[in-house]
Amino acid sequence: SQSAQAGGTMGWRAPELLQGFSLHADDGKERLTRAVDIFSLGCVAFYMLTRGGHPFGELYEREIRILQNQVDTSALSASGDDTVEAEALIKQMIAPIPSDRPSASDVARHPFFWNAAKRVAFLQDVSDRFETLERAPPSFALELLEQSAESIVGPDWRRRFDKNFLEDLGKFLS
């Protein structure tokens, strides 16, 4: 009898690979999906953006940390601009539950990959949407935005955007 075991490089494998999920649906085990590739891609993206880092730590501790979902993405903030979108995307990609990970097409459409024009257009659309909401009495969405504003963007909204984006924003609004 031949058994099929999933491969992969130590420290870069999804938790379901480490837990022994199956390549085949007929052996009674949970089946592996393409989400294993998304997990690995998330780790590789982190590696590239941090110039050698890994979201689950050093080589010999990675697989235990992957199984325990002990993620540390703090190295991204030190790697430069565009880290908010990158961190959000990578966290989705390395989610411990396969069904919580985005598909490849969802990854490709993520705001991390948007150019400045698309980002500004999105913000304008959102802003325009809130401009049309009832102010007296305020709509539920507007109340929710006002209540949560500081926890979402902090005391200075400009700090939530990278320098290049803010420069482009100034060009679009001029």
For each feature predicted by the language model, list its residue ranges:
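Protein kinase-like catalytic domain
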Residues: L49, L67, I94-I97, A108
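Short, solvent-exposed loop/helix junctions and linker helices
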Residues: G7, L32-A35, G80-T83
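Conserved C-terminal C-lobe helix
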Residues: G80-I94
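Conserved C-lobe activation region of Hanks-type protein kinase-like domains
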Residues: Q19-A75
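Conserved activation segment of eukaryotic-like protein kinases, specifically the C-terminal portion
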Residues: Q2-H24
